[in-house]
Amino acid sequence: MNIHEYQGKALLKSFGAPVAEGVPVFKASEAEAAARALPGPLYVVKSQIHAGGRGKGKFKELSPDAKGGVRLAKSVADVVANANEMLGHTLVTKQTGPAGKQVNRLYIEDGADIERELYLSILVDRSVGRIAFVVSTEGGMDIEAVAHDTPEKVITVAIDPERGVTADDVKKLNAALKLDGDAAKDGGTLFPILYKAFIEKDMSLLEVNPLIVMKNGRLRVLDAKVSFDNNALFRHPDVLELRDTTEEDEKEIEASKYDLAYVALDGNIGCMVNGAGLAMATMDIIKLYGAEPANFLDVGGGASKEKVTAAFKIITKDPAVKGILINIFGGIMKCDIIAEGVIAAVKEVGLEVPLVVRLEGTNAELGKKIINDSGLNVVSADDLDDAAKKIVAAVKG
């Protein structure tokens, strides 16, 4: 689960992290009071959407030369003007896709005297089986591009879970970020704070980009991207209250009601698979044959007929889907259950796109018979390779 920047900063502030003063705004009429509540004279007006690249983004409704989703304002009147221009409009960034996201919230923040911009994140490093800091002196930039072009500028420091952030870890992080004086002292305080927040709130990602060194030599968290482990949210009702479902894909919200692992993608071939590994292999082979998957959907090992029906309906709700591939290897999951669920869904919502089904394993022959006897226009496949070829050919015509 993701939260907005202003929510992430409030959370980090509650742990003792240094963040700028700011006020969230939901209506343009609130912008003036928000700005007057801050010291000024410089303000930053930030679009609050669950996507990166806001500063370089463009609003659909505005002219191409209009400012992006993060704007510097030099007066209260300037804050108000920007709020009126940004709220309710659609911001397109490199992470939103061409559809963009509507800006329904702004964060009016006090300006900062920036000396240097740094990058810091905390994540689960599966290569070493530990939580790790990833830092770079190249902050405020696309960290993926930095890692690709100059990998030596991205430093990873893994943390021993039994010891937490040690003095030696702090020394390594300060050296990697080239911090000294007051900034190094602040690092000695900040790094353990961020690690504590990550652990106690069951985060999956904490990204500060940029972490700044101000002209007075002190550190400040200037941006915060926070993601939480969905499987641990039951332990954090306070975090669940921060959820903004308007920022989430409607199909993903619906899938979560049925405990379906669903992720919307940008392609046009819908996928229903059992098992995450098989689902990824299915998406890979679709791409291999020149098409793009519209989703990741794992119905799991013990799905019921109702769950399969719900999964199929979620796939068909996506207007981008031009074909559907069902790939089931029956173990715990029985192929006849899949067949019954698909037939029930088709009878309810109809079938207007090609459907290719590959069933293998427990009750596979029974599942195939159920589908064949249904009278549905379904193409059977012998194996995964055959299934991928058939659905790609059907979609491409």
From Swiss-Prot:
Q: What is its EC number?
A: 6.2.1.5
User: Pfam families, alphabetically?
Assistant: ATP-grasp_2, Ligase_CoA
Give the pathway annotation.
Carbohydrate metabolism; tricarboxylic acid cycle; succinate from succinyl-CoA (ligase route): step 1/1
Annotated residues for binding of ATP: 46, 53-55, 109, 112, 117
**InterPro entries annotated for this entry?**
ATP-grasp, ATP-grasp_succ-CoA_synth-type, ATP_grasp_subdomain_1, Succ-CoA_synthase_bsu_CS, SUCC_ACL_C, Succ_CoA_ligase-like_bsu, Succinyl-CoA_synth-like
* Cofactors, names only: Mg(2+)
**UniProt GO MF annotations:** ATP binding; magnesium ion binding; succinate-CoA ligase (ADP-forming) activity; succinate-CoA ligase (GDP-forming) activity
Alphabetical GO biological process terms: succinyl-CoA metabolic process; tricarboxylic acid cycle
Which annotated residues bind substrate? 274, 331-333
Q: Does the keyword Nucleotide-binding apply?
A: yes
Q: Which reaction(s) does its UniProt entry say it catalyses?
A: succinate + ATP + CoA = succinyl-CoA + ADP + phosphate; GTP + succinate + CoA = succinyl-CoA + GDP + phosphate
Listed A to Z, the keywords are: ATP-binding, Ligase, Magnesium, Metal-binding, Nucleotide-binding, Tricarboxylic acid cycle
Q: Which GO terms describe its cellular component?
A: cytosol; succinate-CoA ligase complex
| Database matches in Gene3D superfamilies | ATP-grasp fold, A domain, ATP-grasp fold, B domain, Succinyl-CoA synthetase domains
Listed under subunit, the entry gives:
Heterotetramer of two alpha and two beta subunits.
Its biological purpose is as follows:
Succinyl-CoA synthetase functions in the citric acid cycle (TCA), coupling the hydrolysis of succinyl-CoA to the synthesis of either ATP or GTP and thus represents the only step of substrate-level phosphorylation in the TCA. The beta subunit provides nucleotide specificity of the enzyme and binds the substrate succinate, while the binding sites for coenzyme A and phosphate are found in the alpha subunit.
In terms of NCBIfam families, this protein maps to: PRK00696.1 (NF001913), sucCoAbeta (TIGR01016)
Which family is this protein grouped under? Belongs to the succinate/malate CoA ligase beta subunit family.
Instruction: Please give the PANTHER family that the UniProt record associates with this protein.
Output: SUCCINATE--COA LIGASE [GDP-FORMING] SUBUNIT BETA, MITOCHONDRIAL, SUCCINYL-COA SYNTHETASE BETA CHAIN
Q: What is this protein called?
A: Succinate--CoA ligase [ADP-forming] subunit beta
Organism (species): Mesorhizobium japonicum (strain LMG 29417 / CECT 9101 / MAFF 303099) (Mesorhizobium loti (strain MAFF 303099))
